[in-house]
């Protein structure tokens, strides 16, 4: 009876997650597109529902909600379904919609979709060869084979996003990095833009006048005919045509310059708005957050470097370890186990909420940046694939933030994976991503004032 009640709770929550994914799809991703493939919408919503269910089961594990056997059953079922979606269903439909957009392959799209899926499976399987991700006793058809490979892709993605986010967040929030933009700077750039537009207009007028003169002289229509006439037309040109070509090249260069000046002007306006915003209470709050995240970024880079150099992976979750150090230093009586459970629950909850929110915001921006009416179905399925792999990998990494007694069921469900490898791999990719982001933002920040203030 308790199993039925537990299952009804899980099914209800999955229906709610599915509905939220459906609404997000309709009101965010596809609100500007008329053509909707319901199979794409269903796949995206189902992936979102089962991804969120994994996080729900982590919270239930900490709070002790549901029977332990029920939790284990739903862990196993949820994991099998999400892997089925990520490895078999989504890649096949991505190939199907890619082939459907090619007219030459339209009649045999099912065959070519299968070929694309087999190609994906080959590279997906070969991905596991260079990495020590499995225990030697796992068979080739075990579920761990799929989890391990999905984990490598997802952890790599998480580390790349985390590395860039850890650097970009303080850079975006802190007023220290804002350039000092005045109205004089904006007016000077707008004056250059107007001068460029005037030059483009005057040169186009000259081109129109030249064409009119050539037309009146009969240089446009009196073309020689026959073979020798064609040879002559190639080897010789009308007196005004060379001038037209030269002016057209100048116009093209000026139009490119005008586009750059327009973008720089818009950037200066945005920077000026950010300067005004930084003076408000909310702006000062985000500025404080920027300093906090900059300290976190430095600490995270330092710890990732230490972990890589000394091949170190923590065995105790950060909350418990931090409380133990504080209690030992202050010499006070404190129930470490009791409070570490509650603080770990809050920490894991914050990680889950921020991960889901941050990923959805990133997915929305990414979708609007690259999608079109023809490619939108493929892009949504790619986002569903990324989302599922991201959440599966989050479970692998969140495991280390949980007290030891709560890690057991996750270890049992995921199998005997080499969890330490995933943490080391995350540190390596995070460090590369963070340092690359620092270099990129430094060069962009250094070059921006020179570009904007050039005479």
Curated annotation (Swiss-Prot):
Looking at the Swiss-Prot or TrEMBL record, what is one Pfam family this protein matches? GPHR_N
Localisation per UniProt entry: Golgi apparatus membrane
Q: Which GO terms describe its molecular function?
A: voltage-gated monoatomic anion channel activity
Is Cell membrane given among the entry's keywords?
no
Its keywords, alphabetically, are: Glycoprotein, Golgi apparatus, Ion channel, Ion transport, Membrane, Protein transport, Transmembrane, Transmembrane helix, Transport, Voltage-gated channel
InterPro entries on file: ABA_GPCR_dom (IPR025969), Golgi_pH-regulator_cons_dom (IPR022535), GPHR/GTG (IPR015672)
The membrane-topology field of this record reads: Multi-pass membrane protein
Q: Per the record, GO CC terms?
A: Golgi cisterna membrane; Golgi membrane; Golgi-associated vesicle membrane; monoatomic ion channel complex
Q: Which residues are glycosylated?
A: 180, 243
Query: What is catalysed by this protein?
Result: iodide(out) = iodide(in); chloride(in) = chloride(out); bromide(in) = bromide(out); fluoride(in) = fluoride(out)
State the disulfide connectivity: none
Q: Spell out where the chain crosses the membrane.
A: 5-25, 46-66, 79-99, 114-134, 150-170, 290-310, 343-363, 378-398, 425-445
For this chain's UniProt record, which GO biological process terms are given? intracellular pH reduction; protein transport; T cell differentiation
Question: Its function?
Answer: Voltage-gated channel that enables the transfer of monoatomic anions such as iodide, chloride, bromide and fluoride which may function in counter-ion conductance and participates in Golgi acidification. Plays a role in lymphocyte development, probably by acting as a RABL3 effector in hematopoietic cells.
Protein family according to the UniProt entry: Belongs to the Golgi pH regulator (TC 1.A.38) family.
* Complexes and interactors: Homotrimer. Interacts with RABL3; the interaction stabilizes GPR89A.
Protein name per Swiss-Prot or TrEMBL: Golgi pH regulator
- Organism annotation: Bos taurus
Q: Which gene encodes it?
A: GPR89
């Amino acid at each position: 009876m308790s199993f039925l009640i537990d299952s009804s709770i899980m099914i209800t929550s999955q229906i709610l997650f599915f509905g939220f994914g459906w609404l997000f799809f309709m009101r965010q991703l596809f609100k500007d597109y008329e053509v909707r493939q319901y199979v794409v919408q269903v796949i995206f919503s189902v992936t979102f529902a089962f991804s969120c269910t994994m996080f729900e089961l982590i919270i239930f594990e900490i709070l002790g909600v549901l029977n332990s056997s029920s939790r284990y059953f739903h862990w196993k079922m949820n994991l099998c379904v999400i892997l089925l979606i990520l490895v078999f269903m989504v890649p096949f439909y991505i190939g199907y919609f890619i082939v459907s957009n090619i007219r030459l392959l339209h009649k045999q799209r099912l065959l070519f979709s299968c070929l694309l899926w087999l190609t994906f499976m080959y590279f997906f399987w070969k991905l596991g060869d260079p990495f020590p991700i499995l225990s030697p006793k796992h068979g080739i058809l075990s579920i761990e084979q799929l989890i391990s490979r999905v984990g490598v892709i997802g952890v790599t993605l998480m580390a790349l996003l985390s590395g860039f986010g850890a650097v970009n967040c303080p850079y975006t929030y802190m007023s220290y990095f804002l350039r000092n933009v005045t109205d004089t700077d904006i007016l000077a750039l707008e004056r250059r833009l107007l001068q460029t537009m005037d030059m483009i207009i005057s040169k186009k007028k000259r081109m129109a006048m030249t064409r009119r003169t050539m037309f009146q002289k009969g240089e446009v229509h009196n073309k020689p005919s026959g073979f020798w006439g064609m040879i002559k037309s190639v080897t010789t040109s009308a007196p005004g045509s060379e001038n037209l070509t030269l002016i057209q090249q100048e116009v093209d260069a000026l139009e490119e310059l005008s586009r750059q000046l327009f973008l720089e002007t818009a950037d200066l306006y945005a920077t000026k708005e950010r300067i005004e915003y930084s003076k408000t209470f909310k702006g000062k709050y985000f500025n404080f957050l920027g300093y906090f995240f900059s300290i976190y970024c430095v600490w995270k880079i330092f710890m990732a470097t230490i972990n890589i150099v000394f091949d170190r992976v923590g065995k105790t979750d950060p909350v418990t370890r931090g409380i133990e150090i504080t209690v030992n230093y202050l010499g006070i009586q404190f129930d470490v186990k009791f409070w570490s459970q509650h603080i770990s629950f809050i920490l894991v909850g914050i990680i889950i909420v921020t991960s889901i929110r941050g990923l959805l915001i990133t997915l929305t921006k990414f979708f609007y940046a690259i999608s079109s009416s023809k490619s939108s179905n493929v892009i949504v399925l790619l986002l569903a694939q990324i989302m599922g792999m991201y959440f599966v990998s989050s479970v692998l990494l969140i495991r280390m933030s949980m007290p030891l007694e709560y890690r057991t069921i996750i270890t049992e469900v995921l199998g005997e994976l080499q969890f330490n490898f995933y943490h080391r791999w995350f540190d390596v990719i995070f460090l590369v991503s963070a340092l690359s982001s620092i270099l990129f933002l430094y060069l962009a920040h250094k070059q921006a004032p020179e570009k904007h203030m050039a005479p």
